[in-house]
Amino acid sequence: MAEIQTVTAPVFLNQANSSSVNKHTPAEAQETFKQALSQAINNVNDLQKVSAEKTELLAKGKIEDLHDVMITGQKASITLSATVEIRNKVIEAYQEIMRMQV
């Protein structure tokens, strides 16, 4: 089975607190953000896949631990919900910036 990895905020916090942030060019900062965002989305996808695999194995009778399957499913659900909320906040912030007059 694949090991479950969680999406954590410290990756972003450590980058924001380091003094090397000021040394990045805008292109490097975009690439760093792109990599962090891509990694977070991949982690959400991995959780969804593990949940689907365990659910399928439970349905086939190969796993008898319903408790583990339910916990895995809830972790995937909560992570996806948090990701959707973050996306909504990013879109809201973008729309607010676009409404600003220059």
UniProtKB/Swiss-Prot annotation:
GO cellular component: bacterial-type flagellum basal body
Organism: Halalkalibacterium halodurans (strain ATCC BAA-125 / DSM 18197 / FERM 7344 / JCM 9153 / C-125)
Entry's localization field: Bacterial flagellum basal body
UniProt keyword list: Bacterial flagellum
InterPro entries to which the protein is assigned, alphabetical: FliE
GO biological process, one term: bacterial-type flagellum-dependent cell motility
PANTHER family tied to this protein: FLAGELLAR HOOK-BASAL BODY COMPLEX PROTEIN FLIE, PTHR34653
Record-given protein name: Flagellar hook-basal body complex protein FliE
Disulfide-bonded cysteines: none
Gene Ontology MF terms in the entry: cytoskeletal motor activity; structural molecule activity
Highest taxon of source: Bacteria
Family designation: Belongs to the FliE family.
Entry-linked HAMAP family: FliE
